[in-house]
Amino acid sequence: MPFFAVAFPVFDPVAVAIGPFAIRWYALAYIAGIVIGWLYARMLLQRQRLWGGPSPISLEAFDDFILWVTIGIILGGRTGYVLFYNLDFFIRHPAEIFELWKGGMSFHGGFMGCVAAVVLFGWKRKVPILSLGDITCAVGPIGLFLGRIANFINGELWGRPADASVPWAMVFPNAGPLPRHPSQLYEAGLEGIGLFVILALMIRAGALKRPGLIIGAFLTFYGLARITGEFFREPDPQLGFLWGDMTMGMLLSIPMVIVGILVMITTWRRGRGAPAAATPSSEAAS
């Protein structure tokens, strides 16, 4: 074990307090991620050269979609946590499923909620589902980055014990005396910054002209980033390791990589093809 460890900074769990009303860091991360992602998506939708013509999604339609995807993230994230990470506990205490302020969200569940929101909104509003999925995935790393930073501020989801070769190891307040990897920051870099850069470069190279390509890339590279981060992250105590060093996060991410690769191959072979949908003016009238 290392002879020296970086002191974990002390943060107030409440980010903003106005009288009796308080917003915690994790909630603030969700709010900021949605707002910044919405602004970034609007910027992409207005750049016709990225789409090879007018965007197949109007700004008005995307503004309406934000509420749908927000609900999908929250419901899916909570449902995923209940089913994948702590089902036995919630079977015994079902009322606590609704106590979101106590924490407990799953990315994989939130992603499935996003998929449901994209499909349902696209079907209802006659918006091209693949293009809507592409733009949603393009902004996803923003929320992932902010969420992992909030995990770090809260001193939760810490890493595995580190050895002397890791001078930046930290002793987390609720994780015992051993210095540990700040795995939340690793994941913020991999799932947030790294994934955002990859997708942004692909978009700049014309990926939005091939509907579904960004979806496939997101699935693939997020899955790889999450699997890598899991090697440094302490598994959830109620689950532990499943098989050898396999964790629940790895188990849920492996199918993402496989599906993502298949989607990218299929999309690339299909080529650009026909325009994804009607112009924004015709879509807005639907």
Curated annotation (Swiss-Prot):
Entry GO MF terms: phosphatidylglycerol-prolipoprotein diacylglyceryl transferase activity
Pathway listed: Protein modification; lipoprotein biosynthesis (diacylglyceryl transfer)
Keyword Cell membrane on entry: yes
Residues binding a 1,2-diacyl-sn-glycero-3-phospho-(1'-sn-glycerol): R148
Location in the cell: Cell inner membrane
Protein name: Phosphatidylglycerol--prolipoprotein diacylglyceryl transferase
Source organism of the structure: Rhodopseudomonas palustris (strain ATCC BAA-98 / CGA009)
Keyword Cell inner membrane included in the entry's annotation: yes
Family statement drawn from the similarity comment of this UniProt entry: Belongs to the Lgt family.
Keywords: Cell inner membrane, Cell membrane, Membrane, Transferase, Transmembrane, Transmembrane helix
Coiled-coil ranges from the UniProt annotation: none
Principal cellular location given in the protein's record: membrane
Enzyme class: transferase
